[in-house]
Regions:
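N-terminal export signals
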Residues: 7-28
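Long, structured stretches of catalytic cores involved in phosphate-ester chemistry, encompassing
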Residues: 3, 23-100, 104-687
Length: 687
């Protein structure tokens, strides 16, 4: 049943969009001649539901401050059967961007759309797809992507995705693309200042006239700076082609605002300051350039009205770590990104914001560097991280005054701090409510941050390999800051899944610049391993990953180098034993370094290390495709070579590997079970 036109008008007003209502099909009534040069960022659509979708373009004008465009939506690419026609304003106040909500559409239907100015100068033609009805039993297909730093590479993955989708059977074509953040990188390098990083060429993206410089990075501090970056990114032809082919469903990660920022604090390396106005500017630019059903701060249809804020210190926090300073609250609430999408019978997608409401980084105190130290190449004792994550609530409210590593003792910097939260109290309550209300076969949590533990077992290192011994029976963590080390919060969520008997729970995420597949579990051995769902991380589209950094930065004389890299003959890429370390442990790595015998190395796998992992590739790039049915969830990783230069091939270039992870729907009380199969290529040490 379609919503009424009156209800549709209220929805359009709530999300700050112009609107059009579909009617009977008729021929086009406008003059139109394609002039892509006048629409330099292309066209896009976003957040489809069963009867509507948001359309977007940017058409800058040299004269005046406000102009009108016409948008048409048709059932055919030739616009013989036009079902919607409306005028929409573009203005200098919105950087000449347009958002149009088209309603009255048919469910699970493909449409074509285009924009035109008063002189008949037209945009390229875009294609979009509405969602199926909530009771539609058809299979759901979508892709999830993240981390597209075109300052340091090219978007060959999108071209591969388009090439394959155009040739896929209709029932297997993608319905939408879920973008899990780092759509832009606010840390911009200039090619005339730094020509390369690692083995990558630095490409021109934007110039930040009003920003701040940290090292080689230029960082925006105003909306004009963020807009310049979006315009530079959206000049990429492969990104334009992808946005013109599918509706995108997007949520920001950190780089849409600030690299190491949280709430409205700007932080990039040594640069840290209150950034309430910067957070508002980042939200405004995101709102202007990504079509999404997100709530703006004003009731206007045409623009984001930024709330007046001042950059003042945030000194008072509530019991959950939320800064109570009024400008901070105004800034982080200037745009609410968390939302849901129902897509047929088989998908309830719940999307969360991992940066606007999170507490301060609980692992950043400099004194903690003494725990493990540089000798262990970034390994940090898991028990110590759990103490820090738990804050004042650790051990039933009795956290230790000190944290120990062998004979080293440091004061517990989180003893009086709240337990770490990534979601914040209000959003977490909303998320838990949505999870319990979800009725689709699969309840998929779309969040930008990975949730699978990244740990190793240095307690099994041979005696004497390092100057200091690692504590017995103590696992190590190799990253922090995402849900992989947010034990308190994720346990709360996973316990809800188990206690509410929720089946078909799965997480899709990004940010880590690597491929991961495994299980959502609150604890790992020696705790009780009880997975309640599936968990996947998609690799970066472009951005450099862990292995690329280690190839250039890992000390060559470290006795622990074989745990991460095994060097080969000159000119050949090293073997990435870091994948083995996370999946199988130090004994497997050292055996592989000695013998190059992968089967023998796997025979030494530590069964208590990573029962939650089925696959990990810290050197992967590409995208993931998901297929959901009544019976199973199928997640396919498509990995491409490092996208350092643009491929000249229509298919985006070669594939490194294609691997699929399949799980049948489980009943309440049962454990989910993944089956992994390599369809083509070589996954190396990832399994």
């Amino acid at each position: 049943m379609k919503i009424s036109r009156r209800t549709f008008l209220r929805v359009a007003a709530a999300i700050g969009a112009s609107l059009a209502w579909a009617g009977p099909a008729r021929g086009s009534r406008i003059r139109w001649q394609e002039r892509r040069d006048l629409y330099p960022q292309g066209v896009a659509s976003g957040d489809p539901d069963q009867h509507s979708v948001i359309l977007w373009t940017r058409r800058p004008f040299a004269q005046g401050t406000r102009q009108l465009l016409t948008v048409e939506v048709a059932e055919d690419e030739e616009f013989i059967r036009v079902v919607a026609h409306a005028e929409t304003p573009v203005a200098s106040a919105t950087d000449w961007t347009a958002r149009v909500l088209i309603g009255g559409l048919e469910p699970a239907h493909t449409y074509w759309y285009r924009f035109s100015d008063a002189d008949g100068n037209g945009s390229r033609v875009g294609r979009t797809i509405t969602a199926p009805r909530p009771d539609d039993p058809r299979t759901v297909n979508f892709a999830f992507v993240s981390c597209q730093d075109v300052n340091e590479g090219k978007l060959n993955a999108y071209r591969r995705m388009i090439y394959e989708d155009e040739r896929a059977p209709a029932a297997e074509q993608l319905g939408f693309v879920l973008h899990l953040g780092d759509f832009i990188y606010e840390v911009v390098e200039y090619p005339d200042e730094v020509k390369t990083r690692y083995d990558r060429t630095i490409y021109e993206v934007a110039r930040i006239a009003d920003g701040h410089k940290v090292g080689n990075f230029h960082i925006p501090l105003t909306v004009e700076g963020y807009r310049a970056i979006y315009k530079g990114y959206l000049a990429d032809p492969d990104l334009q082609d992808a946005r013109a082919r599918w509706p995108f469903v997007a949520i920001w990660d950190n780089h849409e605002f600030s690299w190491q920022g949280w709430q409205s604090i700007v932080k990039a390396g040594s640069f840290e300051q209150p950034g309430q106005s910067v957070k508002v500017a980042a939200n405004q630019a995101w709102f202007e350039y990504l079509p999404a059903r997100v709530s703006p701060p004003s009731g206007t249809l045409e623009r984001f009205d930024p709330p007046p804020v001042q950059n003042v210190p945030i000194t008072e926090f509530d019991r959950d770590g939320l800064g109570l300073e009024p400008n901070n609250l105004a800034a982080i609430n200037s745009l609410k990104g968390y939302r849901t999408l129902r897509y047929g019978r088989h998908l309830d997608l719940i999307i969360t914001d991992q940066h606007s409401y999170r507490s301060a980084d609980c692992f950043s105190d400099p004194s903690l560097d003494k725990l493990g130290g540089s000798e262990f190449l970034g390994m940090f004792p898991e028990p110590a991280m759990q103490v820090l994550d738990g804050g004042r609530g650790f051990n039933g409210g009795n956290p230790p005054p000190e944290i120990h590593f062998n004979d080293t003792h440091v004061p517990n910097p989180q003893r009086s701090a709240p337990p770490q939260t990534i979601l914040g109290a209000e959003q977490k309550a909303w998320f838990k409510e949505q999870l319990q209300r979800a009725t689709a076969t699969w309840k998929v949590w779309g969040n930008s941050l990975g949730a699978l533990d990244s740990r190793a077992d240095p307690q099994n290192l041979p005696a004497g390999l390092t100057k200091e011994s690692w504590p017995a029976n103590t696992f190590a963590m190799l990253s922090g800051g995402d849900f992989g080390t947010a034990w308190v919060e994720r346990t709360e969520i996973y316990n809800l899944v188990r206690e509410a008997k929720i089946t078909g729970f799965a997480i899709v995420s990004g940010d880590r610049h690597s491929f991961w597949a495994g299980y959502a579990a609150a604890e790992l051995p020696p705790g009780k391993f009880e997975p309640v769902g599936l968990s996947f991380v998609g690799a970066s589209l472009v951005s450099p990953g862990t292995m690329e950094a280690y190839e250039h930065r890992l000390p060559k004389d470290s006795p622990l180098r074989p745990l991460f890299l095994v060097d080969k003959e000159a000119g050949a890429r090293p073997d990435w034993t870091f994948n083995l370390l996370l999946r199988h442990g130090v004994r497997a790595c050292l055996e592989y370094a000695r013998s190059s015998d992968l089967q023998r190395a796997r025979s030494l796998s530590n069964p208590d290390l990573a029962p939650h992992l089925e696959f990990v590739d810290l050197g992967g790039h590409g995208y993931a495709k998901v297929r959901l049915s009544a019976a199973e969830m199928r997640t396919e990783f498509v990995c491409i070579p490092r996208p350092i230069t643009r491929s000249e091939s229509p298919d985006g270039g070669p594939i490194r590997y294609r691997v699929v992870h399949t799980a049948s729907l489980w009943k309440s009380g049962e454990r989910p079970q993944l089956k992994t199969a390599v369809l083509e290529g070589d996954v190396g040490l990832a399994i």
